[in-house]
Amino acid sequence: MNLIPMVVQQDGRGERAYDIYSRLLKDRIIFLGTPIDDEVANLIIAQLLFLESEDPDKEIFFYLNTPGGHISSGMAIYDTMRYIKPPVATVCVGQAASMGALLLAAGEQGKRSALPHSRILIHQPLGGFQGQATDIDIQAREILRLKDELSLILADLTNQPLDRIKTDTERDYYMTSQQAKEYGIIDEIIVKRS
């Protein structure tokens, strides 16, 4: 069941009903509250590109509450965040796990934040393979390549040594907001909006 609240806004021309995500987009807010797959990534990318076309100099706010998801889908969002001109401020509400943690860290330096009770998780890419032995070998080499690529990106975003990233992502590595700040994934913890 997919419930999307509607909000009613009044202006000089009368009342207008918006789904909540469209209303947030008017304020340059993108909300990711699902696992990341190709469909979700395409929606996020379209919103980023739209907001850039609306005003290439005005900040975009990207709120995340996601368990992560597909690497290729997440990397498409990551690349778009880096590609567009407006700065993207990231905010974790709830959790930013796996690819979600990388997207959280990919926000504009100084504008990456989390609410106090957020949970951040980094780990190595997950993969399950089946098929012929040669195909499994190809898939295993690709997952190792992705592991190295994601480790390099995370090391760059957090200013952590690559060896530490590789060690910490060998297994699930959970962090509180405070630990994520110390790690370099976020820059601040937001208790109350100022």
UniProtKB/Swiss-Prot annotation:
Q: What class of enzyme is it?
A: hydrolase
Q: Which InterPro entries did the record assign?
A: ClpP, ClpP/crotonase-like_dom_sf, ClpP/TepA, ClpP_His_AS, ClpP_Ser_AS
| UniProt GO MF annotations | ATP-dependent peptidase activity; ATPase binding; serine-type endopeptidase activity
Top-rank taxon, per record: Bacteria
**Residues forming the catalytic site:** S98 (nucleophile), H123
Q: What is its main location?
A: cytoplasm
Give the subcellular location. Answer: Cytoplasm
The chemistry this enzyme catalyses reads: Hydrolysis of proteins to small peptides in the presence of ATP and magnesium. alpha-casein is the usual test substrate. In the absence of ATP, only oligopeptides shorter than five residues are hydrolyzed (such as succinyl-Leu-Tyr-|-NHMec, and Leu-Tyr-Leu-|-Tyr-Trp, in which cleavage of the -Tyr-|-Leu- and -Tyr-|-Trp bonds also occurs)
Query: EC number(s) per UniProt?
Result: 3.4.21.92
Gene Ontology BP term (one):
protein quality control for misfolded or incompletely synthesized proteins
The family database entries (CDD domains) matched by this protein are listed as:
S14_ClpP_2
Q: Cite the entry's keywords alphabetically.
A: Cytoplasm, Hydrolase, Protease, Serine protease
- Give the CC-aspect GO terms: cytoplasm; endopeptidase Clp complex
Write down a Pfam family by its short name.
CLP_protease
- HAMAP family listed in its UniProt record: ClpP (MF_00444)
Q: In which family does this protein belong, per the annotation?
A: Belongs to the peptidase S14 family.
Subunit info here reads: Fourteen ClpP subunits assemble into 2 heptameric rings which stack back to back to give a disk-like structure with a central cavity, resembling the structure of eukaryotic proteasomes.
Q: State the protein's purpose.
A: Cleaves peptides in various proteins in a process that requires ATP hydrolysis. Has a chymotrypsin-like activity. Plays a major role in the degradation of misfolded proteins.
This chain's protein is named: ATP-dependent Clp protease proteolytic subunit
Q: Which gene encodes it?
A: clpP
